[in-house]
Every structure is written in C-alpha cells, then in structure tokens.
A protein has these predicted regions:
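Cytochrome P450
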Residues: 1-458
Length: 458
C-alpha cells in the first residue's frame, strides 16, 4: 500500500503562496518553483517577454513569438548547451567577442552531453537528424501504433487489478518503455530486461537539470549504448528482416554508412528522451481526468475530443519546461539586444501560456481551437521527431483506460482530500512532472465490446 504523500512543509509540493519575486527566486535552484512555476513565468513576462534573470545570468524568454523566433534561427543560436544551459558553464569566457562560433566548435567536446543529438548544430545535426528520420519513418510509426493498443492492454491487465494503483510506476512507465522498445525493434526476449533496467530510475531527482546543483549524468544512457551497440554490430554482420537491421544499414543523407556509435547515439536518445517526456504527459493528463469529473465525462462520451485534450495538456503542462540556446553573434529578440555568448532559456511552459497567443491561457479547455499551436515539442530543426508517437501513446493510453473503467479518481488516502491535495513534482528546471500519482478506479466488466475489439480503429 502506498503511504500518504502529505508534505505540508515540502517545497516540492504546492506552496501556500505563489512565488513570484524574480530577484529573490533562483529558477534553477529554488524548489519553491518546482510545483507550480506558472506564477513565476507570469511575473517574468509581466516585466518583459525577454528578461535576464539575476542569479545565473540567463535571458529568460517567456513570450510565444519571441521563443518561436529563436527556435527557428539555428544560424544565430547554437544548441551546444541546449540541455544543461548555464551549468557547469562554458569552458572559456565568451564575453566581449563579436562572434563566438569558432570558440563553440573549439570547445564543444568539453561540454556536457556533447554527444547527444539535441546539442548538435548544423551540419553535424543535419546529417544525424537525417539518419534519425530514416529510422522513424511514417511506415514504422504506423506499424508501431498498431502495437500500442496491445501494449496498453498488456500493462493495464496488471495495473487495474485491485481497483487502485500508482499510475506512473505501474502503468505509464512500463507502457511507454515497451512502446519505444517496439518502435526501435528491441527483441521481444530482451524487453523485460530493458524494463527492469530502465524502469528502476529514481523518480525524485538525480537526473539532468536537478535543482540540487548535481552535474548531469549519462546513466542510463550507458546501458542503452551498450545494448544498441551489440544489436547494430550483430545486424551488420548478419542482416535479418527486422527493424534492427534497418537501423544497422541506415545511411546518412549523403549515402555514407554511419559509424556504429552514430546509430547508437540516435537510437539511445530516442529511447531515453521519448520515454521520459511521454510518462510526464500521460501522468499530467490522468491527473486532470481524475480530478475533473466534467472533463472525464466529456472524454468518455465524446472520444473524438481526446486528441485536442492531449494538445491542451501539452500546452498547459509542457513536459519540458524549456530549452537553452547560446547566441553566436549579437542579436535582437523581441526588441531586446542580446550580446554574443549569451545563454537564453526558451520557456515552453511560459510561451504556451502567453495571453497574446492563447486567450485565457491558464484555463484548461479541451475544446480550445488553437491548442495545437503550442511549442511543447519545440520548433525548427530541433523539433521533436517523436511527437507523433507521444501523441499516439497518450491518446491510446487514455482511450483504453476509459474503455476499461467506469470511473477514475485520485486517491484521497495518498494525496489528501480534494480541497487540499498534495502532489510532488520532479525537482528539475528541465522536466515538468509528478513523481507519483495514486489512482482509484471502477473497472468495467470483462469481455465488453470495446475490450474484445480494442475500442479503436487503427
């Protein structure tokens, strides 16, 4: 049985007063901003949509148009520090130079996570992104979506037993991990090992962007590197008619065969990043469904509303709080002059609540007509290639949970009464998501039409 998460003095749970003092609060270190950063975002944007915060010297971009303009400008802005931002800092001073492009390339290998696709710039990024898009083709995504329904039911079979369960650890985590494993062709006999190894990661910190100031670690990437290197090398020696052989023989856009490590990096990044963010999206979606009977009723009776509900969840609860960019040359963003060598944080979660783009932005509206204009998946050359998969996983997960239950509720025993909930959030300035979500549900009778036919059209 899960213990109560009551944490009245815990900064990782909801604060009693919204923290908005920009001068007093360090976004990258203050746990008071973890549970609900929206008031802080609004305070930033209220001063200026492009504003330098005083603690880490980062220019915070909270405006929608301003963020999109930066995301679309890979010529002016480098992604070399896109994951870690100002930490641990650039190896050499960048101030006072007209163009820091040469310094970036000279010291790129000294930066954290420099072997990961999100930190690449053109032309290296162009080649590796091209390789990635040869792995995640529309045909492969369609094949994978057909398997998503079965995988959802497979995990739900165990999760729904007993009438309650911890959603993130018992459903969202295993489900999304198995979906990614299927997409990348991990052999069926190896998937339980992947599940055991990858799903034992700590839920409450220790990863990239933690507010405790710990440096970024590569685990569990090292495990993924080892596994996929073995797969790729084996398929190059002995090709088969399977997805892994497609991975092993995929070429760069110019037709050259990548080194094994290049393929491994792309596959491992898709596996790790895609699984983590979709878990957060699924859990935030189910929290709303369980907390809001009106929305649950709407989605149960009008299933065609689910895709737009997912978009609205991406807008209001962006799983990635933001991405970083480093200005290579002096530039103006939203009327604000930015010197070369400046770290900017593009706050997706703030831009997605910009009232200039989204009227009444703090209201979650499943019928919002422009919900899909959010930038939760980024824009430009680094936009998330797995966005169609994340959308499909979340839609299918919601549909099958609704098919197989008649009511879903948040556990009062674990999270407290409805008027005084306690939720804990991951203490990072990168990810936005719950650490636990205990749900209770009334399960439908087996062998209903939706169960036997899958409740969907593929």
């Amino acid at each position: 049985m899960s213990e109560s998460l009551s944490t009245s003095n815990d900064p990782l749970s909801q604060p009693s007063e919204p923290p908005t003092d920009i001068k007093a609060l360090d976004f990258f270190r203050d746990d008071r901003l973890v549970a609900d950063p929206a008031p802080y975002y609004e305070a930033l944007r209220g001063q200026c949509p492009v504003l330098r915060e005083p603690h880490q010297n980062v220019v915070m971009v909270t405006g929608y148009e301003e963020a999109v303009s930066v995301l679309n400008d890979a010529e002016t802005f480098s992604s070399c520090t896109s994951v870690t931002g100002p930490f641990p800092g650039f190896p050499v001073p960048l101030e006072g130079r007209d163009d820091v492009s040469e310094l970036i390339e000279r010291h790129r290998d000294e930066l954290p996570l420099n072997d990961q696709l999100p930190t690449f710039d053109p032309p290296v990024h162009t080649a590796h992104r091209g390789l990635l898009m040869r792995l995640i083709t529309p045909k492969r995504l369609k094949e994978n979506e057909a398997a998503i329904w079965n995988l959802a039911d497979r995990v739900l079979d165990g999760y729904l037993v007993g009438g309650e369960g911890e959603f993130i650890g018992e459903f969202a985590g295993p489900f999304t991990l198995l979906v990614i494993a299927d997409l990348l062709g991990v052999p069926e006999e190896d998937r339980e090992e992947f599940l055991a190894h990858m799903h034992q990661r700590p839920q409450e910190g220790g990863g990239i962007g933690t507010t405790d100031g710990q440096s970024a670690a590569h685990s569990p990437m090292e495990y993924l590197y080892e596994q996929f290197a073995g797969y790729i090398e084996a398929r190059r020696r002995e090709p088969r008619e399977d997805v892994l052989t497609g991975l092993a023989t995929a070429t760069f856009p110019d037709g050259t065969l990548p080194e094994v490590i290049d393929v491994v990096r792309v596959a491992a990044n898709v596996f790790s990043a895609g699984q983590e963010t979709t878990v957060r999206l699924l859990s935030s979606s189910l929290k709303v469904i369980a907390e809001r009977p009106d929305i649950q009723h709407l989605l149960r009776t009008e299933r065609d509303r689910i895709p737009n509900f997912v978009e609205e969840m991406l807008r209001t609860e962006s799983p990635i709080k933001g991405d970083f960019r480093l200005s290579k040359v002096p530039v103006t963003v939203g009327g604000v002059d930015i010197p070369s060598g400046t770290t900017l944080m593009l706050l997706n979660g703030a831009a997605n609540r910009d009232p200039r783009r989204f009227p009444d932005p703090d209201t979650l509206d499943p019928t919002r007509s422009n919900a899909r204009q959010h930038i939760a998946f980024g824009r430009g050359i680094h936009s998330c290639p797995g966005a169609p998969l994340a959308r499909a996983e979340t839609r299918v997960g919601i549909e099958r949970l609704l098919d197989r239950t008649t009511d879903i509720r948040v556990s009062d025993r674990v999270h407290g009464p409805a008027d005084a909930r306690d939720y804990r959030y991951i203490p990072t300035f990168i990810l936005r998501g719950l650490t636990h979500l205990q749900l209770e549900f009334d399960v439908t009778e087996p062998n209903t039409e939706s169960d036997t036919e899958g409740g969907h059209t593929a």
